[in-house]
Amino acid sequence: MTALSVNDYLRQHIRTVPDWPAPGVQFRDITPLLQNPKVFRVLIDAFVHRYMDRALRPDVVAGLDARGFILGAVVAYELNVGFVPIRKKGKLPFTTVEETYELEYGSATVELHADAVQPGDRVLLIDDLIATGGTMMAGKKLLEKLGATVMEGAAIVDLPELGGSERLRASGLPLYTLVDFSGH
């Protein structure tokens, strides 16, 4: 038996759910990655080992609602840096800044506590998946409103056919993803 790359190993543990949430959609379910402690460790270590490098080490990790919280909090803990949640509108109790972005049908708004980061902070922005890139772009804009620098965006899964990773890179945001899936 040959050794698997981390990417291939993780890919084997991502469940594809056909026709969910709508006909024709291939939903990439990351919950099996989280359920198995060995697989979860490999997943977290893949991010932690990258960001332990001094040149890539963030001051803060920001996680996007909601699965970005799971990844971001653990990665921040392992790197011994702070974690800040970027939430859907109306979920944070203190003074916030907000950013609205377009969805396929309508729009959504995310927000961040106004004191979540300091000017000049280097932030790693993390989520589970990049599809259209709208949520990550909104998170980047929020952090920049507060004077932080988003040094990189990270996700487990990239769905390149939906164009999000290309749009994010075109905006100047470097990306690190672990598993690319064609098709959506």
From Swiss-Prot:
> Per the record's keyword annotation, is tRNA processing included, yes or no?
no
GO CC, any one term: cytoplasm
Record carries keyword Ribosomal protein:
no
What GO MF annotations does this protein's record show?
A: adenine binding; adenine phosphoribosyltransferase activity; AMP binding
Q: Which InterPro entries match?
A: Ade_phspho_trans (IPR005764), PRibTrfase_dom (IPR000836), PRTase-like (IPR029057), UPRTase/APRTase (IPR050054)
Which pathway or pathways does this protein act in?
Answer: Purine metabolism; AMP biosynthesis via salvage pathway; AMP from adenine: step 1/1
Under PANTHER family, the record lists:
ADENINE PHOSPHORIBOSYLTRANSFERASE (PTHR32315:SF3)
The UniProt subunit note reads as follows: Homodimer.
**What is this protein's name?**
Adenine phosphoribosyltransferase
Q: Which organism is it from?
A: Acidovorax sp. (strain JS42)
